[in-house]
Amino acid sequence: MLENKIVVLTGGGDGIGWECAKAYVKAGATICILDKNQLAENKLEELKTTKTLALTCNLANEAEVANAFNTIIEKYGRIDAIHNNAAIAHPSKTLDQTSNSEWDLLMDINLKSILYTTRYGIAHLKKSQGCILNTSSMVGSIGQDNHAVYVATKGAINALTKAMALDYAPFKIRVNAVSPAAINTPTLQAWSQEQPNKGEIEKYLNKLQPLGDMPAGDVIADACTFLLSNAARFITGTILPVSGGAELGYRTLI
């Protein structure tokens, strides 16, 4: 589905991002992973392809993002898709408990990184008539307690996706977002293990989706592969829920 496409993927080193990296390679793409952590060689070897470029990049630093895009263009000559996946969710706090530095960090990683990847990638997407995909979250539509700033960034991503879709449609550039619910990733597992009521949390998360237990990240990766592919060539401005129906309404979970 993604044969011969050059895909830039932020936050591709673990969790949903890593599942997307594997799916994109399987679909035929060359992937350029931008991640704050250096990817170990043995992890890249799991992809079983030479069609990868891994760059250590602080996505909140404009100069580093600019340098990363210059490196990608020097190596491949074009960009066909950008998947803005990098995000942080913690700390778990109400708004009044949030410090200025915590606010700035979440805004920088979750939102300003999209500004930077667009600023340095859009000229190349205009040439390729490519696409942009943003990773949002169900909480950006329905809210969540004790995650005020994270929720705000995901709600902003939903609105930004629609605005970008309108702005770049004249250039035949599609812009969409994928909106997961709870996904069984190492990050979520680590967080739940730290909670005093971890057993109750795990039971709740596994009941959250009407379609069944909390899925692994590959279900999100499959949806992302579709949205980046030509099969979605007439889809833009869409916030695609991949949530097993978790956002449909209140359910009795006990």
Annotated model-derived regions:
Residues 93-95, 99-105, 205:
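Substrate-binding pocket helix/loop in short-chain dehydrogenase/reductase
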Residues 118, 153, 161:
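Active-site helix of classical SDR
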Residues 123, 166-170, 233:
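Alpha-helical segment proximal to the catalytic Tyr-Lys
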